[in-house]
Amino acid sequence: MRSGPGGDHRAFTASWPWPSLLPETFSARGIEELFGPAQRAGEVLGASVGIALATAALTTAVATLAGRALSHYRFFGREALRFAVLLPFLIPATVFAMGVQVALIRAGLAGTVAGVVLAHSIVALPYAALIMADAMEAAGSRLEEQARVCGAGGARAWLTVILPMLSPSLLSAASMSYILSFSQYFLTLLVGSGKVKTLALVMFPYLASGDRTIASAYGVVFIAATLAVFLLFEVLLRKQTAREIDYFNG
């Protein structure tokens, strides 16, 4: 696509001057260059999806425990815990990222995938924790208590009653955590020290450059990968709902 004197290229068009409603010519140059050996797009995409899924799993697990503590228990320091969970909301992103980077350097996790996953999880935790706290408060504890009365232990009550009941909220928290991690740029750049390559990290320099052919192609891959994972989450949710319906229908 060419939209002015300097011109911007797009993933599937060679020319798209204003005010034309449709492109004048189409071209696959952006996609061809993206999947060429120089870009290593497959490797970067795999790393991005892996980091985002790991972040979603870790964040959702911690958020579930935090949500249960905040919604079901009254203890000393409860409000302090709530404040700590929401703290990333209150600190400017740049200040927060610098602080996390220093902490991870001291822990020896800077420049590692584990450090990036941990940093992303800290950012995503407030969103996921709020989702899970509200879900657990709405669900209450009556079904869990009934399961225990029927002889279910703590682990069995969680696996057979609590988690299935909370599956929509769990998938919502996981989806939120996934998209936050998948789209992180600045935090990944700092914590990853340029060693951990993700889709957002590789795409940003092309967005800032004059020729946006590769950036547009990366954008297409970015959207497609996100939709694919969300479709997977939707399939999992539908399967869980179908199992619950079959169970109650006998």
Label the model's feature ranges.
Residues 46, 50, 74-82, 125, ...:
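Amphipathic cytosolic juxtamembrane alpha-helices at the membrane-cytosol interface
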Residues 1-4, 122, 129-133, 140, ...:
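Transmembrane alpha-helices
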Residues 3-16, 46-47, 96-108, 116, ...:
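A structural signal for multi-pass alpha-helical bundles of membrane permease subunits
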Residues 1-46, 50, 237-250:
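N-terminal, non-cleaved signal-anchor transmembrane helix
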Residues 133-144, 148, 154-161, 216-250:
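C-terminal transmembrane helix and the adjacent membrane-cytosol boundary/short C-terminal tail
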Residues 18-22, 28, 72, 77-79, ...:
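Membrane-interfacial helix termini and adjacent extracytoplasmic/periplasmic loops
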